[in-house]
Amino acid sequence: MEKKKVVLAYSGGLDTSVAIKWLQEKNYDIIALCLDLGEGKDLAFVKEKALSVGAIKSYMIDVQEEFANEYALMAMQAHTLYEGKYPLVSALSRPLIAKKLVEIAEQEGATAVAHGCTGKGNDQVRFEVSIQALNPYLEVIAPVREWKWSREEEIAYAKENNVPIPINLDSPFSIDQNLWGRSNECGILEDPWAAPPEDAYEMTLALEDTPNKPEFVEIGFEAGVPTTLNGTAYPLSELIKTLNALAGKHGVGRIDHVENRLVGIKSREVYECPAAMTLITAHKELEDLTLVKEVAHFKPMIEQKITELIYNGLWFSPLKQALHAFLQETQKNVTGMVRVKLFKGHAIVEGRKSEYSLYDEKLATYTAQDEFNHDAAVGFISLFGLPTKVYSQVNQKKVEA
């Protein structure tokens, strides 16, 4: 019987390594796919590990710049903070992983793709909805969801099948990281009353260990895109990683969040997003300077919907594409410089300037240079308040009657 091909999203961890053996038993040839999303680790060994475990082919693709420009950038411009806190670190990477799974599957003539998600997380939804949107004819296999093993049973299976056991298996935490940030759950973090231990963090310093002097950074934007940091031009992925180090040193971007998952449960996770939080803060301030009032007041409603769509795995939905078009239109004049003070866990904007600034000092000042027409206020107030005045007159007459 001829074996079918399946492309597996491979991380090098226990779950996806065991999945290779499990899929082999189901008569599949496995093609492993690992993506470098900017987690800051050497992933060459992951490619080789997949082959040693049993994959017939293994890909390791650097997608950092694609992730930065086509995924993280939109999240920054839309100020995506799920439930006001979470910058969608993991949610942003899933549609890109799904896209590459489909591309490799079509290239290799595979009939199926597979992922290592459990049956109680958001990621299974994000992967499978994205894959269905890109190629509805591919079979999607979720080994971890299907086998329903305990951790002990999974380890026993790995030992029986000579699957290497990761040296960090005794770590209580489940971690996902890319250049937009780091998420951490499980272990003591499952108790929402327990303070996160310091070893739960990697990208940021504790406030007690941060410098006692602030550091200032100037971020340059062109049409809504961060392009320079302290006067130096960077590709977006490098700018984000550089800012991660700068802001992380000052403890910026630590987030402790009890969130409402898509699958109906609450979970407690700890996030580190130093660059994401700094860029979102700076970008919002530049928009305040350059967007007209009507757009500035309407855009947050669109941002909320974009955030929900991304969190819920609907990156490739028609609505998300339509809202993205609106978002891009708003960014044409978001060009300028923002000065940010990094200090003791805070990214504080202390200055902003733009050639497209709608702030006119001669209209705003209270000095002798004031050019605002104060006499125009009388007529404006009369017309602006007229509906309220008429309503009051009518209802007072009824009361008197």
From Swiss-Prot:
GO molecular function: argininosuccinate synthase activity; ATP binding
Pfam families attached to this UniProt entry: Arginosuc_syn_C, Arginosuc_synth
Origin superkingdom: Bacteria
Positions annotated to bind L-citrulline: Y86, N122, R126, S174, S183, E259, Y271
One Gene Ontology CC term in the entry: cytoplasm
GO annotation (BP), single: L-arginine biosynthetic process
Binding site for L-aspartate: T118, N122, D123
Cellular localization per UniProt: Cytoplasm
Principal subcellular localisation of the protein: cytoplasm
Residues where ATP binds: A9, Y10, S11, G12, G13, L14, D15, T16, S17, G116
EC number: 6.3.4.5
Keywords linked to the UniProt accession: Amino-acid biosynthesis, Arginine biosynthesis, ATP-binding, Cytoplasm, Ligase, Nucleotide-binding
Pathway: Amino-acid biosynthesis; L-arginine biosynthesis; L-arginine from L-ornithine and carbamoyl phosphate: step 2/3
The keyword Hydrolase appears for this protein: no
Catalysis performed (reactions): L-citrulline + L-aspartate + ATP = 2-(N(omega)-L-arginino)succinate + AMP + diphosphate + H(+)
Family annotation (NCBIfam families): argG, PRK00509.1
Family classification: Belongs to the argininosuccinate synthase family. Type 1 subfamily.
Subunit and interaction comment: Homotetramer.
The name this protein goes by in its record: Argininosuccinate synthase
Originating organism: Bacillus cereus (strain AH820)
Lineage, broadest ranks: Bacteria, Bacillati, Bacillota, Bacilli, Bacillales
